[in-house]
UniProtKB/Swiss-Prot annotation:
It is a single-pass type II membrane protein. The keyword Metal-binding does not apply. Disulfide bonds join 215-254. A lipid is attached at residue 2 (N-myristoyl glycine). This is Transmembrane protein 106B. The lineage of its organism: Eukaryota, Metazoa, Chordata, Craniata, Vertebrata. One of its GO terms (cellular component) is lysosome. Its main location: membrane. Residues 2-97 are cytoplasmic. The modification Phosphoserine is found at residue 34. Belongs to the TMEM106 family. The chain crosses the membrane at residues 98-118. Expressed in cortical neurons (at protein level). One of its GO terms (molecular function) is ATPase binding.
Length: 275
């Protein structure tokens, strides 16, 4: 009994020591196994999403992979791209430069539009009488004058101008002796000038029949009478109409058919009303 009692504590101590070592090892093994399980779990999670490379027509270029990655075609609206905050695409360069350039281009185009489309004057210059053809009615003591006049119309605009009509009348001694109207005449191009002739038929009769004796008097070589030429030119551009009027006093020979040169016509244009 003594030996058995003496060995029991030793045995128990050994067993306790063994159990302590075993428990310590078990704890270490438990920690290791738990870490292994965690790593296995992570590797299992990663293994659920294997690396797949998409090539060919079934994929498109990934916009966040610098053009080197591919994503399945048809999933562009389902996938979300994560872009780093420091990505250059989130901070575009030269934004101020682009804005200033856009503003400058807009201002330049606006200035050019205003410059070219701004309405400028249309100049009408009465050149004079080009020709006068005379005929008489001796029974009624009437004089018929077909007077052809010349106008220069200058378009100072950078777009075409339409000459809609020309209205003219001739006065003798404050009495209107002839009228004429021409419609849909011509178009004048940008920065262009056109010369237009128009004829006004006139009749001198009734209370002015005394002029018949003057115009048919054979002792006088030149039978000049003073006529006032009035002309109104109507032009149109961009739906806007504009009228320009001119008045000139002109010598006309009522004794014979006469063709005037432009220089002579200018010389005869001496009696003008004071403005």
């Amino acid at each position: 009994m003594g030996k058995s009692l003496s060995h029991l504590p030793l045995h128990s101590n050994k067993e306790d020591g063994y159990d302590g070592v075993t428990s310590t090892d078990n704890m270490r093994n438990g920690l290791v196994s738990s870490e292994v399980r965690n790593e296995d779990g992570r590797s299992g999670d990663v293994s659920q999403f294997p690396y797949v490379e998409f090539t060919g027509r079934d994929s498109v270029t990934c916009p966040t992979c610098q053009g080197t990655g591919r994503i399945p075609r048809g999933q562009e609206n389902q996938l979300v791209a994560l872009i780093p905050y420091s990505d250059q695409r989130l901070r575009p360069r030269r934004t101020k430069l682009y804005v200033m350039a856009s503003v400058f281009v807009c201002l330049l185009l606006s200035g050019l539009a205003v410059f070219f489309l701004f309405p400028r004057s249309i100049d009408v210059k009465y050149i004079g009488v080009k020709s006068a053809y005379v005929s008489y009615d001796s029974q009624k003591r009437m004089i018929y004058l077909n007077i052809t006049n010349t106008l220069n119309i200058t378009n100072n605009n950078y777009y075409s101008v339409e000459v809609e009509n020309i209205t003219a009348q001739v006065q003798f001694s404050k009495t209107v002796i002839g009228k004429a109207r021409l419609s849909n005449i011509t178009n004048i191009g940008p920065l262009d000038m056109k010369q237009i002739d128009y004829t006004v038929p006139t009749v001198i009769a009734e209370e002015m029949s005394y002029m018949y004796d003057f115009c048919t008097l054979p002792s006088i070589k030149v039978h000049n009478i003073v006529l006032m030429m009035q002309v109104t030119v109507t032009t149109a551009y961009f739906g806007h109409s504009e009228q320009i009027s001119q008045e000139r006093y002109q010598y006309v020979d009522c004794g014979r058919n006469t063709t005037y040169q432009l220089a002579q016509s200018e010389y005869l244009n001496v009696l003008q009303p004071q403005q």
